[in-house]
A protein has these predicted regions:
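Alpha-helical transmembrane segments and their membrane-interface boundaries
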Residues: 1-101, 105, 112, 119, ...
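Generic structural marker for isolated residues within well-ordered, non-membrane alpha-helices
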Residues: 42, 125, 143
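Transmembrane helix boundary and interhelical junction motifs in multipass membrane proteins
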Residues: 54-59, 136-142
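Hydrophobic transmembrane alpha-helices of multi-pass, membrane-embedded glycosylation machinery
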Residues: 61-63, 142-146, 165
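Membrane-helix interface "capping/anchor" motifs
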Residues: 70-79, 128-139
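Generic transmembrane alpha-helix signature in multi-pass membrane proteins
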Residues: 94, 128-132, 141-148
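Internal alpha-helical transmembrane segments of multi-pass membrane proteins
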Residues: 101-136
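Juxtamembrane/interfacial segments flanking transmembrane helices
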Residues: 134-141, 178-183
Length: 192
């Protein structure tokens, strides 16, 4: 079975398909199929484990990985680093504003402490990603997911990062099988 899959993968490579068909059609189909597979696998992992393997910022991350995989924002270093910064900044903001034991903002509403935590988390995430040279826009959503209390337990943040890592592995494998020179870690020089 593996030989069949790899044989098909060699024959149906995205760059060669783009040469024969509309690039918008091929890339749209590639993004569609891989978005379904990536988020479907994460959602299945969430159902099986009862852990939050699926969260809103995985959606834009998957889109970057499968539509613009060669942009710096989609490389593994920026994806993992950006989400780690976002999760850490969100949690630090919860701690500083005394909100670690509060219900999520969607349940208890938004009070001034939550305003401060959300604003601080996004500011910290934005600045730290620039300073660390790991820009990944979906991490802005990750930090708000945490600072708004949707995921607020340290173990949930660990699961969040495992989910991001699994998505990066999927992105690497799927893009490479499709013939796309997706980077192993850092962005390619001169790309983006």
């Amino acid at each position: 079975m593996a030989a069949i899959v790899f044989g098909l993968a060699r024959r149906v490579r995205v760059p060669s398909l783009v040469q024969r068909h509309s690039s918008t059609t091929v890339l749209g189909l590639f993004a569609f199929v891989n978005g379904v597979v990536a988020i479907g696998l994460m959602a299945a992992a969430a159902v099986v484990t009862g852990a939050p393997f699926i969260f809103p910022s995985l959606g834009p991350t998957a889109f970057l990985l499968f539509y613009t995989p060669l942009l710096p924002a989609a490389c593994p270093r920026n994806t993992l680093g950006g989400h780690a910064i976002g999760a850490a900044a969100g949690y630090l903001s919860l701690v500083l504003f005394g909100l670690t034991h509060n219900a999520p903002a969607l349940v208890e509403g938004v009070a001034w402490g939550r305003v401060g935590a959300a604003a601080l988390s996004l500011g910290l995430t934005s600045g730290a990603m620039v300073w660390a040279r790991v820009p990944h826009p979906p991490a802005g959503a990750t930090t708000l997911i945490v600072s708004l209390g949707i995921l607020r337990e340290p173990w949930q943040l660990g699961v969040l990062m495992v989910g991001v890592a699994l998505l990066v592995v999927q992105g690497f494998v799927i893009n490479r099988v499709a013939g796309i020179d997706y980077p192993a870690w850092a962005p390619r020089p001169g790309v983006g």
